[in-house]
């Protein structure tokens, strides 16, 4: 990309954070969690193979959703394509249909004496045909494929009613991997809450994760028929997802007056299993951030409207009830955790961050947060500590999902009003049962759902997606309601798009190649001439001592809004940053001429962090981005000094070497620092 090309679109806000999606407070009567969790928990959930000694089937998995508010009315907009109402009783085929979804046809060339397979599907998070599902909508497209390297319940409809002792065979590269006896339709797993049967003609078996890989094909034989035509599933990514939990204890909250770290630092084991059942990943790894927690006495809220809609300047908060709207502190914390994730080199990776916010009011009492925020596609979200509907909804935003009802209205979601009317069924391996698209009788929403949900021809309620009022649509015993197949496919796409730290790769990184159905070595590159960082902000040093420093700054001079947060130290990563006292580093970021000619071109490089260690040594780091007009790094933005504008407020986060204790942190005024470092720069802030 040449230096003279048209500038790329500016990112949504001045701090570099994705736009958050605000969610109405979710009703909750949960007390403080009392589950005991080891300090600094790090749990690893791999897909589990549960093949019985007889090699007949057990069940596998998708665990449903639970979420936020704003369910549509039953009289909402019509589906993009007509939905077919699900039949009431047992059926020989999957109940329901999938508007807008396309399934790959099964092989059909069968010779005499050969077993025919009418349908083959794999139940993981959802019941997905071997060729996958795909959608083409007016303003979006998506696909959902069987998940590679994850156990699956295979479901087979056999064409011959007299087949005796059918067996599923797995083959790869001409070699037989093994065979599984198929359980008869009478042994099919039940449906949640004792609901209608998924089907009455499906034979089944649990396929181990080792067989659920590209290149494997499956055929079915019987003692009285030869093997069927083989089907090779089209697989989605085999990537894992890491969930990093970083609790924020705010305004004096601690283990004596609030839910303790032992219960906030990670979901309990059962909840982790349910999250894994929900997300389309081969493995879920849950860890508490190596810092443990981040305790803050003060939080700075950026310019935003108050409860009445009136614009307010940035301001400091020392108790939750001081915020001027219900999402002020959450918004500030989402910006912090998003920027900290980037500073640690986790931005492009398959790592989702979640920050439980534990806060006190001005009376010193624990305050119920009542909601959450997630940066759409950012990989980061904040919310309460209970790991229920708020959590799964906000992490949905982090995966790139918006509110499903809004997306339906825009032609970017296939099912009316953000519902599951038309989705394939889900499946949960932990309960070993199918998840209907209809609200189950044991759901808390069941009794009154007709006034707020889409209805089928018999007046029964369809579930809402967790991204549109699904909280309460799950069966008793579940924490989360059921995502639609479409939104699960979009989560799978987010996972597939991530860079994977991969020791098996020659470069140390890999990415999923959907066409090849395989990981390919990935070499980090600097996009957009360094506009958003170097080498995609991947680590240049990993697993080293670091100090994370967060600075908020109001160029408008709003009272108390310019603030250096207390640093915290842990074992983390360092990304490429620049020392303005080095001529070589200044040359590298010189606008339009340096190695990274756009590094400072977006909104300037006018501020420097100076860190003085306890031994007197110092380190300097340029803070990328400031208050310049977009693509004019020598001219201030028109609203740079307008206290009511987000253009007057900035939050930076940066990691610096942490092998020595910090003595002082200073923010320096260094205008257009690529031209030279001032001999005696003005100190704007000091801690």
Curated annotation (Swiss-Prot):
Pfam families, sorted: Peptidase_M66 (PF10462)
Alphabetized UniProt keyword annotations: Hydrolase, Metal-binding, Metalloprotease, Protease, Zinc
Domain of life: Bacteria
PANTHER family: DICTOMALLEIN-1-RELATED, PTHR39540
Molecular function terms from GO: metal ion binding; metalloendopeptidase activity
Cofactor: Zn(2+)
Active site: 394
Region (Disordered): 1-45, 73-112
Enzyme Commission code: 3.4.24.-
Family matches, as InterPro entries: Dictomallein (IPR051256), Peptidase_M66_dom (IPR019503)
This protein's record includes keyword Ion transport: no
UniProt gene name: dtmL
Domain spans labelled Peptidase M66: 233-501
Protein name: Dictomallein
Keyword Protease: yes
Cofactor note: Binds 1 zinc ion per subunit.
GO annotation, biological process: proteolysis
Protein's organism: Burkholderia pseudomallei (strain 668)
Record: residues binding Zn(2+): 393, 397, 403
Cystine crosslinks: none
Protein family according to the UniProt entry: Belongs to the dictomallein family.
């Amino acid at each position: 990309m040449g230096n003279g090309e048209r500038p790329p679109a500016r990112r949504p806000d001045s701090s570099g954070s994705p736009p958050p999606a605000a969610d109405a407070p979710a009703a909750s009567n949960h007390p403080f969690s009392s589950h005991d969790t080891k300090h600094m928990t790090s749990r690893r959930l791999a897909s589990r193979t549960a093949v019985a000694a007889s090699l007949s089937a057990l069940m596998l998995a998708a665990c449903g959703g639970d979420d936020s508010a704003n369910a549509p009315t039953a009289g909402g907009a019509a589906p993009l394509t007509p939905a077919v109402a699900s039949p009431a009783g047992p059926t020989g085929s999957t109940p329901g249909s999938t508007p807008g979804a396309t399934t790959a046809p099964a092989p059909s060339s069968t010779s005499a004496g050969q077993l025919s397979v009418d349908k083959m599907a794999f139940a993981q998070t959802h019941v997905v045909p071997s060729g996958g599902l795909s959608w083409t909508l007016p303003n979006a497209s998506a696909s959902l494929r069987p998940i590679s390297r994850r156990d699956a319940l295979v479901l087979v409809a056999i064409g011959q009613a007299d087949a005796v002792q059918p067996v599923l065979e797995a083959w790869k590269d001409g070699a037989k991997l093994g065979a599984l006896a198929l359980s008869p339709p009478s042994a099919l797993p039940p449906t949640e809450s004792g609901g209608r049967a998924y089907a009455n003609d499906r034979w089944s078996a649990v396929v181990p994760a080792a067989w659920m890989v590209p290149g494997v094909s499956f055929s079915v034989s019987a003692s009285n028929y030869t093997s069927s035509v083989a089907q090779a599933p089209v697989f989605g990514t085999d990537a894992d997802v890491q969930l990093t939990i970083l609790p924020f204890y705010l305004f004096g909250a601690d283990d004596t007056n609030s839910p303790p770290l032992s219960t906030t630092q990670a979901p309990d084991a059962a909840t982790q299993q349910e999250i894994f059942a929900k997300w389309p990943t081969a493995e879920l790894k849950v860890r508490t951030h190596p810092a443990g927690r981040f305790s803050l006495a003060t939080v700075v809220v950026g310019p935003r409207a108050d409860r009445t809609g009136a614009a307010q300047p940035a301001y400091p908060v020392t108790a939750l009830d001081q915020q001027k709207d219900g999402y002020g502190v959450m918004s500030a914390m989402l910006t912090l955790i998003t920027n900290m994730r980037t500073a640690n080199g986790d931005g492009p990776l398959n790592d989702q961050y979640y920050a439980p916010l534990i806060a006190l009011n001005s009376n010193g009492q624990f305050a119920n947060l009542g909601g959450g925020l997630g940066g759409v596609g950012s990989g980061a979200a904040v919310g309460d500590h209970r790991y229920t509907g708020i959590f799964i909804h906000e992490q949905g935003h982090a995966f790139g999902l918006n509110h499903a009802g809004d997306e339906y209205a825009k032609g970017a979601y296939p099912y009316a009003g953000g519902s599951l009317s038309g989705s394939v069924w889900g499946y949960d391996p932990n309960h070993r049962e199918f998840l209907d698209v209809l609200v189950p009788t044991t759901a808390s929403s069941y009794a009154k759902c007709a006034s707020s949900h889409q209805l089928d021809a018999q007046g029964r309620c369809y579930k809402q997606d967790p991204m549109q009022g699904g909280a309460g649509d799950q069966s008793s015993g579940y924490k989360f309601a059921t995502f639609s197949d479409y939104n699960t496919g979009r989560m799978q796409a987010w996972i597939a798009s991530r860079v994977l730290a991969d020791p098996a790769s020659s470069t140390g990184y890999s990415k999923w190649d959907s066409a090849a159905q395989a990981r390919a070595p990935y070499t980090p590159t600097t996009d957009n001439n360094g506009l958003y960082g170097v080498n995609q902000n991947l680590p240049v040093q990993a697993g080293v001592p670091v100090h994370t420093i967060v600075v908020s700054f109001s160029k408008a001079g709003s009272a108390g809004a310019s603030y250096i947060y207390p640093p915290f130290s842990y074992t983390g990563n360092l990304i490429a940053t620049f020392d303005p006292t080095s001529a070589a580093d200044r040359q590298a970021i010189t606008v339009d001429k340096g190695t990274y000619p756009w590094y400072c071109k977006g909104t300037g490089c006018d501020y420097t962090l100076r860190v003085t260690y306890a031994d007197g040594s110092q380190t300097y780091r340029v803070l990328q981005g400031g208050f310049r007009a977009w693509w004019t790094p020598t001219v201030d933005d028109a609203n740079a000094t307008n206290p009511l504008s987000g253009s007057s407020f900035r939050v930076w986060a940066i990691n610096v070497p942490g092998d020595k204790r910090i003595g002082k942190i200073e923010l320096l005024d260094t205008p257009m620092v690529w031209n030279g470092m001032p001999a005696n720069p003005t100190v704007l802030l000091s801690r």
